[in-house]
Amino acid sequence: MIITAIDTNIYDQPEFVEGRDVIGVRFEDLVLDKRIQRVALPGGEELGLRLNHGHPILREGDVLKADDKTVFVVEIIPTDVLVITPSDIHQMGFVAHSLGNRHLPAQFSKPGELTEKAAMIVQYDHTVVSFLDEHGIEYQRTELVPPIPFRHSGHTH
């Protein structure tokens, strides 16, 4: 079966799953924006994704396939990340500048979203841990599903 569009998300339309079993199909963060891919459903059946150009990134709860009894939905595998919580604006600037020079994709959270303080979120990297430890910058290693997949962007000097 070839899927060309995602029309429903169970979090947008929870009534869609009433009376049906919901089965997650696991995706890594790195493939959520790939338009063309093959995925294996639990039980061995394969689905092909051939989404149109400009299709939004796959997100948690997108319905891949449904019948009268079962709904197969996107389930995003949590990513190993560092949640960095600098003590002040100076330390935040230092961290952002230093990690930015490494061209690491980063995301940011507001106070109260992930931690009490604003945070910078990067994918786990042992060299980043060494840098943070060396400079006494507070961080926590955890797994989470980021709201937007981490992506390396093109870069030139």
From Swiss-Prot:
Can you name this protein? Urease accessory protein UreE
Q: What induces it?
A: By urea and nitrogen starvation.
* Keyword tRNA processing appears in the UniProt entry: no
Q: Which GO terms describe its molecular function?
A: nickel cation binding; unfolded protein binding
Highest taxon of the lineage = Bacteria
What subcellular compartments does it reside in? Cytoplasm
Q: What does this protein do?
A: Involved in urease metallocenter assembly. Binds nickel. Probably functions as a nickel donor during metallocenter assembly.
Q: Which UniProt keywords apply?
A: Chaperone, Cytoplasm, Nickel, Nickel insertion
Q: Which GO terms describe its cellular component?
A: cytoplasm
Taxonomic placement? Bacteria, Bacillati, Actinomycetota, Actinomycetes, Mycobacteriales
Q: Could you state one GO biological process linked to this protein?
A: protein folding
Q: Which SUPFAM superfamilies match?
A: Urease metallochaperone UreE, C-terminal domain, Urease metallochaperone UreE, N-terminal domain
Q: Tell me which species this is from.
A: Corynebacterium glutamicum (strain ATCC 13032 / DSM 20300 / JCM 1318 / BCRC 11384 / CCUG 27702 / LMG 3730 / NBRC 12168 / NCIMB 10025 / NRRL B-2784 / 534)
Q: Which family does it belong to?
A: Belongs to the UreE family.
Identify the main location. Answer: cytoplasm
